[in-house]
Structures are given as structure tokens and as C-alpha cells.
Amino acid sequence: MNIGEASKTSGVSSKMIRYYEQIGLISPALRTESSYRTYGDNDVHTLRFVRRARDLGFSVEQIKELLALWRDRSRASSDVKAVALEHIAELERKIAAIQEMTRTLKHLAGHCHGDDRPDCPIIEEIANGSAQVNMEVNPRFGVAALK
């Protein structure tokens, strides 16, 4: 099947399929004589695996590790569990940071008069950065990676 059919069947966009090939997450597709990519059922199964892992929030590096474990029939389930538990810990750190941001914003919004006056603690906080949120800078998304 061509890339459009593989995309439709797997639920992964054509653009992402090309990207996953480029970064080595999936094997490069076979090519027809006219250089069109062709995909088989195994490729689509792998793409579905990748899509589901992304839906669960795994990083590309974690997905590479999971794919290697998936393909290794002699794997130990403890290795897979370790990847999952590490990811759960990351998710819990993100949840805690989001909850802290929510508390901070609720506090600031509660102290903002919300009227015609120009003074507003929300703007002052953003300008001065006095509230501390347990975050670090992610070069791709700005403040999003958690400590």
C-alpha cells in the first residue's frame, strides 16, 4: 500500500510517517520503481504501535526502546515494566507541576479586581516572575519539561 493508505490504516499522518522514517523510529519504506513508498501489514502494525505509544505520552526515545523490546521475543517483561514505571513517574511530576501552576493562577486571579483599573497581580507576576513554579525550560516548547 502507498503512504496515504498506510496513513489511513494506521492513523498516523503521512508527514509523521516520513518523520519517523527520517529519525529512524521505523525502517525506511520499500520503494517502487517510480520511488513511491510502499508499506506492508507489518509496517502498518508498527505504525499503530508507535501511534498508541505516542497517545500514551511516551517520548520518541522511549518508543524506540519499547519497539526494540516488542521485537525482542526473548525480552524480560521487567524491562518493559521499567520503561512504563519511569513514564508514570514523569507523568506524575507533570501533573504535580500543572496542579501547582493552577493553584498559582487561581491565587493570582483571586487577587485581581477584574475591573477598569490597570493594576493586576496576574500581569505583575508574569512581568516580575516572583511566583516559583517547579519547571525547567524545554528548548522545543518553552517552559514545559518538569524537574
Swiss-Prot record:
Disulfide cysteine pairs (residue numbers): none
Start and end residues of each HTH merR-type domain: 1-69
Known DNA-binding region: 3-22
Keyword DNA-binding attributed: yes
Pfam hit, one: MerR-DNA-bind
Gene3D superfamilies: 1.10.1660.10
Highest taxon of source: Bacteria
Location, primary (coarse class): cytoplasm
Entry annotated with the keyword Cytoplasm: yes
Any one GO molecular function term: DNA binding
GO cellular component, one term: cytoplasm
Protein's cellular compartments: Cytoplasm
GO biological process terms held by the UniProt record: positive regulation of DNA-templated transcription
Record's keyword terms, sorted: Copper, Cytoplasm, DNA-binding, Plasmid, Transcription, Transcription regulation
Family annotation (PANTHER family): HEAVY METAL-DEPENDENT TRANSCRIPTIONAL REGULATOR HI_0293-RELATED, REDOX-CYCLING DRUG-SENSING TRANSCRIPTIONAL ACTIVATOR SOXR
Role played: Transcriptional regulator involved in acid tolerance. Binds copper.
Record remark: domains: It contains a N-terminal DNA binding region and a C-terminal metal binding region.
Protein's recorded name: Heavy metal-dependent transcription regulator 2
Organism for this UniProt entry: Rhizobium meliloti (strain 1021)
